[in-house]
Amino acid sequence: MFKLVTLEDAIRIPPERFGEEIDNVGYEQLKIKYDGMVDEELGYVIAVTNIKVNPFGKIIPGDGATFHKVEFSLLTFYPKIQEVIEGEVVEIAEFGAFVRIGPVDALLHVSQLMDDYISYDERQGVLMGKETKRKLQTGDHVRVRITAVSLGRSGGSGKIGVTARQPFLGKIEWIRKDVEKMDATEEVTKEPSKGIGESKQ
């Protein structure tokens, strides 16, 4: 899910930047530090916003710069296990598909795609079910559930695993067709109820 997190930090303003708009300098400093960060607590940092730099700074002996406290907000994406999310397929491989969810690509392994034997057509870049003939390719929109999350360990960019092997998950087109089939089945199985005391003529 996307979140707006409010934080406090301190920034260093070097002497050559004295006289510039302090919030602009603060924004540049925070952008360098936080933009693109992947953190176990924050998740994926997308943007820095709402910056308020304290105009009264401190000087440390031996350093001509000033240090200022700053309040700011981070727009983050924090994937949670069991969360259902929609995304776009951005790459197809023999072992599965990569799905763009928020600012990151999650792995949809072939074993988690559908209840069917899946073949990979490398030339067409398609994963296809043997029995269902359902195809998945780049550009398709899917609904998936997050099953595994690993963030910011050892300076990595994090990993996310997702599944589509549950009811109402998978390619959006498949879900629509499944819902239509269910609605049609319900209409067929419905029988007109007879009122009490009614009898055949």
Predicted features along the sequence, with ranges:
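Single-stranded RNA-binding regions, centering on S1/OB-family and related RNA-binding modules
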Residues: M1-Q201
